[in-house]
Amino acid sequence: MASLIWDQFDYLLSDLDGVVYEGLKSISPAPEVLGELASLGIPVGYVTNNSSRRAAAIAEQLLGFGVRCAPDDIIGSGQTGVALLAEQVPAGSRVLVVGGDGLRDWVSRGGFEVVDSADAHPAAVIQGFAPDVSWRNLAEAAFAIQAGAKWVATNSDWTLPQERGMAPGNGTLVSAVHTAVGQLPLVAGKPEAPIFELAKAHFEAKYGVKQPLFLGDRIDTDITGANKVGMASVLVLTGVSTRKEVLGQRLEGRPRYIIGSMSELLEPYAYPRATKRGYRSGSAEVELRGSKVRLVEGDPTSVDALRAACAVVYTSKTPIFGLDVEPALYE
């Protein structure tokens, strides 16, 4: 049975990197789909772990793709991180900022004094990503934390998709500081709850909506985080997470929906339905034969085949390493 996903939801919360754009380029057909959602009256908000850029700059980039977006339609991990800071240290405190101009702006707007050195005796450190973050920046953060400063990280993404490939993300830099100080930060961004809760409260107040659907390309941040707060999630295979990764997920990382591209948000969704020995989704059927997961009909590279295979694996009650999955389903 196929029906539109939108029968159950009234607004979309979407990741940006790997979903709408990759670096400076849009991911087709995201701009067209976002325009169509707008014409249907479906509000769209953006939730990003990128803390280095100002919301206005992101909105301008989206406008360059033909996507209309107000700066306050973007909730970032920098904004959420500052909200966490306010729970940890008094207003007006000195905060050592590791990250870009966008994060520094949020810290200043939050009523804190921005400093760059541990010698300024900051009450807290907030660590976000920027391409020019250096060893010296990380060292100053480590010195301040060792002296007793509270530590907030905007996000823990290990990698950052770029046009030329995958680059180290903020989580990699946070790990470097962790190695030096022997403790872990509070994390504001996905997959932690604060950013989802802030986004939900903001957009429901702004648009009068109640039922969100979260769209993302990363299982470890987008899908896991949405699941953690009880938000329906859809994985789009245009970014980081792969077919193999989604097949092997435990309960906390399993998306409710899987799509190959954003265009499928506007198409009837082929929900997997049980067959005698497996599941069928659209034109594909996958069966469980003992410990073997095998395609019996359809194109193994299709999203239908992946949906059916995931249904077989997820309901088998057998860990993925105990199953022999046909390689064509995930390669």
Describe the residue ranges of each PLM region.
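Asp-based, Mg2+/Mn2+-dependent phosphohydrolase catalytic module
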Residues: 2-14, 21-24, 28, 32, ...
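Conserved phosphate/oxyanion-binding catalytic-loop motifs
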Residues: 50
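Polytopic endomembrane small-metabolite transporters, centered on the Drug/Metabolite Transporter
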Residues: 77-79
